[in-house]
């Protein structure tokens, strides 16, 4: 069983947290504001991934009340226009949600997720300029199948943390170079096992 959520097709933005986000100066937070779309929106879905590359937001997968998806939606942050019918090559990942995606150079990397029947640990990448998907060999030492994990890129490595496989909750941390090489599990135990969390990098810390 994966977590449930209400569906909403809204996007909200905040200009920043504070003038100096690295220092808690005690100042007021900037308010969130709904984003107005200048075109037809894609509709509601839960547990997709979202990354930013250039001036666009790329949203992959998710589900909308039982239908698991593997489409790629692009929202131009300058024009506020959705691109919903991109002609992609390479096939791409199978429909899923609760996966993780990161950006490194001209690629988006997608790992794992849940497809309504099983948890996954496959690995795919998407080239932004060529609009092409390709699968990446998982290799030895890869994380076990999971969903609800998080990922970031630091110093040329994709770091994957946590998640669950329906029975077990994880607090392991894996690193893999991008471009991909064999994954390696780190020795650090960071937090209690967790899923559906968030992860970000601030300088050299997660």
Please tell me what each predicted stretch does:
Residues 1-206:
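Kelch-like beta-propeller repeat domains
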């Amino acid at each position: 069983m994966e977590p449930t959520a209400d569906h909403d097709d809204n996007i909200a933005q905040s200009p920043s947290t504070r003038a100096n986000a690295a220092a808690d100066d005690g100042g007021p937070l900037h308010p969130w504001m709904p984003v107005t779309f200048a075109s037809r929106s894609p509709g509601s879905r839960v547990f997709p991934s979202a990354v930013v590359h250039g001036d666009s937001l790329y949203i992959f997968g998710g589900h909308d009340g039982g239908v698991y998806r593997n489409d790629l939606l692009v929202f131009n942050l300058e024009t506020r226009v959705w691109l919903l019918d991109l002609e992609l090559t390479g096939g791409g990942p199978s429909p899923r949600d609760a996966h993780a995606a990161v950006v490194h150079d001209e690629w988006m990397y997608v790992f794992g997720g849940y497809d309504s029947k099983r948890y996954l640990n496959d690995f795919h990448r998407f080239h932004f300029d060529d609009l092409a998907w390709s699968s990446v060999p998982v290799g030895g030492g890869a994380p076990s199948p999971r969903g609800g994990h998080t990922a970031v890129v630091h110093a040329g490595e994709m770091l994957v943390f946590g998640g669950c496989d329906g029975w077990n909750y994880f607090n392991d941390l894996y690193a893999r170079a991008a471009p991909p090489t064999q994954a390696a599990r780190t020795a650090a135990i960071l937090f209690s096992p967790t899923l559906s969390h968030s992860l970000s990098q601030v300088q050299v810390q997660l």
